[in-house]
């Protein structure tokens, strides 16, 4: 898979958009099976709930509601493990436009409407399928969406969330590498040593786009261990 750079130099310091990078052949071959938009939670029936519901928030400027990087890769791995019929995949879309400007919003690092949309989806999962295992993920600005939304959920809904994987977490320094008010044992953070975003800045370096291997391997393994 390759990514298209669509950000000008003037805004590159705050962008979380994919740029063109080469990936290994195994990951690249996933492209044909992945979709940038998934809405199984919203469209699925409560009479046919799956084993797993995966909710994901994409990076800035990524297309659809899942993007074309970490989210679909993790989704594919979960579907391969549990079977497509036993995994509902849902991207955070609608009010969450994944725009660049929202990265500047302090202290959340994303918009209030985006946070509320993610909270709505977690609540929907709980009301529609309370016995399904909910897992979640985010990439770049999407990690800010997930961190804020999950931290504001009721304990009942938080308890249904079995695990969360966050890649290139934009609030890593500010949140001390965790989701506030949420169990650290349920959270896995992937932040590359060379990714400046992980140190409390919005400087975008090449390492910010190199999380596909984690998304294909360690992230789904962590979630599967939490799901059981």
Curated annotation (Swiss-Prot):
Post-translational modifications reported in the UniProt record: The 2 disulfide bonds play a critical role in holding the catalytic residues in juxta-position; reduction of the disulfide bridges results in the complete inactivation of the enzyme.
Q: Where is the active site?
A: 140 (nucleophile), 195, 208 (proton donor/acceptor)
**Where does the UniProt annotation locate this protein?**
Secreted
Q: Per UniProt, which keywords does this protein have?
A: Disulfide bond, Hydrolase, Secreted, Serine esterase, Signal, Virulence
Q: Name one GO molecular function term.
A: cutinase activity
Gene Ontology CC annotation, any one: extracellular region
Its catalytic activity?
cutin + H2O = cutin monomers
Show which residues form the site (Transition state stabilizer).
60, 141
Where does the secretion signal sit in this chain? 1-16
Q: Short name of one Pfam family for this protein?
A: Cutinase
Is Lipoprotein given among the entry's keywords?
Answer: no
Supply one GO BP term: carbohydrate catabolic process
PANTHER family named among the record's database cross-references: CUTINASE 1-RELATED (PTHR48250:SF3), CUTINASE 2-RELATED (PTHR48250)
Q: Which family does it belong to?
A: Belongs to the cutinase family.
Q: What is this protein called?
A: Cutinase
């Amino acid at each position: 898979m390759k990514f298209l750079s669509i950000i000008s130099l003037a805004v590159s310091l705050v962008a979380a958009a994919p740029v063109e990078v080469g990936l290994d052949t195994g990951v690249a071959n996933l492209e044909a099976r992945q979709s940038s938009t998934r809405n199984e939670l919203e469209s699925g029936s409560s009479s046919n709930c799956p084993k797993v519901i995966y909710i994901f928030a994409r990076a800035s400027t990524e297309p659809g509601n899942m993007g074309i990087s970490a989210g679909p890769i993790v989704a594919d791995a979960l579907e391969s493990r549990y079977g497509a019929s036993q995994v509902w995949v849902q991207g955070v879309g609608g009010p969450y436009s994944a725009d660049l400007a929202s990265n500047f919003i302090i202290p959340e690092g994303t918009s209030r409407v985006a946070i509320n949309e993610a909270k709505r989806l977690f609540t929907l999962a709980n009301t529609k399928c309370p016995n399904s295992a909910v897992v979640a993920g985010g990439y770049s600005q999407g990690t800010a969406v997930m961190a804020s939304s999950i931290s504001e959920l009721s304990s009942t809904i938080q308890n249904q969330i079995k695990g969360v994987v966050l890649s290139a977490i934009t609030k890593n320094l500010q949140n001390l590498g965790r989701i506030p008010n949420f169990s650290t044992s349920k959270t896995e953070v992937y932040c590359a040593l060379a990714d400046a975003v992980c140190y409390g800045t919005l400087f975008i370096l090449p390492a910010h786009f190199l999380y596909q291997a984690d998304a294909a391997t360690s992230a789904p393994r962590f979630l599967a261990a939490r799901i059981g």
